[in-house]
Amino acid sequence: MKSVATPQSELPHILIYGSVNSGKSTLFNLLVGQEYAVTSPIAGTTTDVLYKRIELPEVGPVVLGDTPGVGDTSPLGAQRMAATRVALRRADIILVLEESLDPQLVKDYPNAIFLPFKLPFSEEREALREQTIELIAKTLKGRKSYRQETLLGNLAKPGDLVLLVMPQDKAAPKGRLILPQVQTMRELLDKHCMVVAIQPEELGATLSKLRAMPDLVITDSSVFQKVEKQLPHEVPLTSFSVLMSAYKGDIHRLVAGAKVLSQLPPNAHILIAEACSHVPTNEDIGRVKLPKLLRKKLGDELVITHVNGDDFPTDLSGYQLVIHCGACMMNRNHLLTRQEEATRQQVPMTNYGIAIAQLLGILDRVVLP
């Protein structure tokens, strides 16, 4: 039976950064143990960000990235550097192949750890490989934010009965569950909880058949209101999106961002950001359900812009609020960096589940991990 690989969004990201012809691709190939990236003496050989999953001793799988070089003067140089900047957003460790470390780089990516390399490489290749891998492993093991984060925090303990409400509508992927549901179920099983998974239509019947009320209910944010109305007030309620907001980002800032919803003008400009790219359906939460709820509460003059994947604008000054998805397909540093960019530009940011709970007036009812 083929094992399922750990999602790339759960792995540490190590990025190689530096000027053109500084040896980035050479170091990349050295670390992956094969000629994976094209190398040449011609400046600007690397034209796109290149990723490769590798296994490090004592650390496990990580994602290593090679990037287009700084100082690319070709006609596409600016676009290549834009791709590099996007990649830097998700980096946990940045191997810098420069004579000196640019202070602005550190300021722009405060959540990353920078490891400068002296140029040119003087060590024997195998020795350099071993030293670099040892340095990366040591850095990751000592990194506070690299600790084993949990989705649930203290919301569930061994023996708890946890009810998962998971609508399988047109927006649900065919033949499988979405990643937050899978990760939540796995963590609950690891905690030795008893897990019951249902669709919203079966909630009432399920509650009536249980001998006791569940210790926790986790729902899809799109049916928050429907579930909340049927639950006794003493039963703790949260959503997969809320869990992801704490797992991937700074939940306290995301909750504070949602409070702004009650203060927005009717013609406010809101950015809705989705981490992954998928074809939306008429039941899509980001493209249909959330905008509909926003306009119901704030009015039809509301201006909503949607972005997907890496198309997150560097200039957020034209928006009064950013509403981000749960970021299940992004690593933690990527979402934290987006939060930092929004904070720097004084633009509040929240996420789908928290925003929906706020708009429905039940945010105080929702438990946070």
Where is each model-derived feature located?
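Conserved C-terminal guanine-recognition region of P-loop GTPase G domains, centered on the G4
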Residues: 52-60, 68, 75-130, 136, ...
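Flexible nucleotide-interacting loop at or near the entrance of a catalytic core
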Residues: 1-6, 128-152, 173
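Charged, alpha-helix-enriched surfaces in structured cytosolic catalytic cores
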Residues: 22, 26, 41, 45, ...
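Hydrophobic "anchor" residues on beta-strands that sit immediately upstream
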Residues: 62-65, 95, 216, 320
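Conserved G1/Walker A P-loop phosphate-binding module
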Residues: 1-78, 82, 86-89
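Conserved GTPase G-domain signal focused on the G5
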Residues: 23-24, 120-144, 246-248, 361-362
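Short, flexible loop segments at the rims of nucleotide/cofactor-binding pockets, characterized by
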Residues: 41, 70-76, 100, 140-142, ...
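P-loop NTP-binding site
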Residues: 156-369
